[in-house]
A protein has these predicted regions:
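Basic, Gly/Ser/Thr-rich N-terminal segments that form RNA-phosphate-binding interfaces in CRISPR RAMP
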Residues: 1-181
């Protein structure tokens, strides 16, 4: 990157890592459920998650009992899974508390589900939004020939996380002058 008037330059003061999915919203008979997995949790900066192991059962969804009758099964998109609660896996309550520290809204935490890493991948890939777009010719206002395309997008309520590394501007100079930030 060049400085003002292209007299010198240096790399940016902020570096961004790849973005990862932490909580993925999926339609269910109970409304949207935000799904995560041990792998997604381990990738966060929360120290307690770094040692999180596999789930006791791989083909189930773990949900907090919310005071009403616990669903025996829950559909996550097209996938129909048995439901287990914190009675079956004590770490579920701790996970909800630790996620709350990240500033995640209570509504999302109350609709939290944890699935195995393998199921998480399938759930995310099967529930991406497919969007269709077309390029419009500005001269005619009509669609351009062969310009219809589709793409997959994350649903609007997806909770993402990434790391930002901020460098101290005092460690940089432009033309032997300190950087003012």
């Amino acid at each position: 990157a060049k400085g003002i008037d292209s007299s010198g330059g240096f790399a940016g003061l902020a570096a961004f890592s790849d973005v990862h999915v932490l909580l993925f919203p999926v339609a269910s008979q109970l409304g949207p459920q935000w799904i995560t997995s041990p792998m997604a949790l381990r990738q966060t900066c929360i120290a307690e998650f770094s040692e999180l192991g596999d789930l006791p059962e791989q083909q189930v969804v773990y949900r907090k009992a919310d005071g009403v009758a616990v669903q025996q099964s829950l559909n996550l998109g097209w996938l129909f899974l048995p439901v287990k609660t914190e009675r079956d896996w004590q770490q579920l309550g701790e996970i909800a508390q630790k996620i709350e520290v990240l500033g995640i809204p209570d509504y999302i935490i109350s609709h939290l589900g944890v699935v195995s890493d393998k199921l998480f991948t399938h759930i995310v890939n099967s529930n991406l939004e497919v969007r269709t777009s077309v390029a419009i010719d500005p001269a005619t206002g009509a669609a351009e020939e062969g310009a219809l395309f589709t793409y997959e997008a994350l649903p609007r309520g997806t909770v993402l996380f990434w790391e930002v590394t901020c460098r101290n501007p005092k460690h940089f100079k432009i033309d032997q002058q300190d950087v003012k930030a």
